[in-house]
């Protein structure tokens, strides 16, 4: 698995929020080639937060993209662990190639982080 797969756990549940919230992970999912937004794609999110380590099962959750290919999931504040504060995101549903992303925050005080997927069919 390419970069960002640290502490990845297959099958994280689809949730409305991870923990107490207060921090937003969001982005888009599009198809490679034509850039079409992809609806109903499962995106898994995890990170080291004020409520737990990125290896803790409770720090993992997933969400689905809407009709515009947009996803958004609230989670506890991300905090630095082994360097810059960052999140982990994965597309792992099988219709497209698996992708792992590890976006880095500009500041530990940021309250949101974006990541954008371009998926290639399998």
List where the protein language model places each region:
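Beta-strand-dominated extracellular/periplasmic modules and repeats
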Residues: 1-122
């Amino acid at each position: 698995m390419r970069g960002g797969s640290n502490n990845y756990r297959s099958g994280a549940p689809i949730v409305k929020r991870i923990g107490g919230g207060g921090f937003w992970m969001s982005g888009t999912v599009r198809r490679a080639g034509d850039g079409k937004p992809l609806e109903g794609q499962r995106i898994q999110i995890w990170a080291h937060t004020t409520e737990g380590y990125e290896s803790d099962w409770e720090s993992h959750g997933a969400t689905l993209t809407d009709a515009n290919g947009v996803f958004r999931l609230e989670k506890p504040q991300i905090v630095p662990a082994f360097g810059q504060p960052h999140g982990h995101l994965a597309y792992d549903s099988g219709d497209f190639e698996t992708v792992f992303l590890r976006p880095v925050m500009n500041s530990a005080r940021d309250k949101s982080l974006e990541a954008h997927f371009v998926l290639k069919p399998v």
